[in-house]
Amino acid sequence: EDFMKGPGKRDLKRGEFAAGITIPTPPARTGSAYVRHTPRVAMDIAVVGVGAAVTLAPKSNVAKDVKICLGAVAPIPLRAVEAESILRGSELTDQRIAEAAIAAAAEAKPISDIRASEDFRRELVRVLTQRMVSAAADNARTPIAKRRAA
């Protein structure tokens, strides 16, 4: 989380480079989902991106762990820690996920620019967080061989 220091700035000294990253194998009953909203297919710059990873407790719909990351709504990718804490240890109901999505929108630090206004980006964060947490939870409940993309 501390590797990104700002736009175009990384935690590297002069002459250093990142040779690779290690991503640990997720626990059982973990699912993830990611989406990015762009104004058109030909444009590579996202208006908003939202990723979610959910680990469910065995044989229940209770979230053991939740990670939500927001892109293009702050100078660097941003963890929505308040939204995560609303869900962690809770049954993942539609209402609880909606509450967390509102919190994620409040945590975002969007700007207004030519692609979208601050208000529009915040609303996109809310809607896409709700969708991605739901999709990640669905994936966590589904055996890997039967999963579909979000």
Model-derived segments and spans:
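C-terminal structural segment of proteins
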Residues: 1-150
